[in-house]
Amino acid sequence: MNCAIDHLVITAPSLAAGTKMLHDALGIWPQPGGEHVRMGTHNALLRLGEKLYLEVIAIDPAMANPNRPRWFRLDELTAQSMPRLATWVARCADIHAAHAACGAMHGEIEAMSRGDLNWQISIAEDGSMPFDGIAPSLIQWQSPQHPASRLEDRGCELVSWSGLHPQAERLGDLLYALKIESRVSILSPPRANLVA
């Protein structure tokens, strides 16, 4: 069981706020993604590699409330919240084996879709993120084509990234259990933070 970084997740109070923040930082607008009907969210995407992308995600005000906590703690955001790099998602060849290696903190494995894309993803019942977002959610794509391959290459790539968490040793053990193929620096500050 090997896992690799699949995508980084920026959460925002609105898709417009999130895409503007990304444009202000990089000078590039992400491409429209689509809607996640089961979660009442929508996204925009920026390719970072052949099987790697950056996702900006927000609640879609035009969609019905899902009557459950939304993923990535989106329900906790207010209109005044700043868009931020909240977490990342690890791609697994066998999500059930990866989930078993992680334990209960990753929630349940659920089937999701967006347009013609289908996948399984780990989602905590309360919408929280493992290790405050520094540990990944888990994903296994059911579609033959990775979504990053559909995106325009705008010359962006992930150069480095670091996870900062007070329980760095425990987090490192989790990433080791997942056999994460990409290098991530894990540091131990007083507060959790993700930097890319």
Protein language model features and the residues they cover:
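Glyoxalase I/VOC metalloenzyme domain signal
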Residues: 1-5, 10-29, 48-196
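N-terminal low-complexity or amphipathic/hydrophobic leaders
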Residues: 32, 39-51
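Short, acidic/turn-prone active-site loops that include or flank metal/cofactor-
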Residues: 34-37, 61
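Beta-rich nucleic-acid/ligand-interaction surfaces
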Residues: 37-42, 189-191
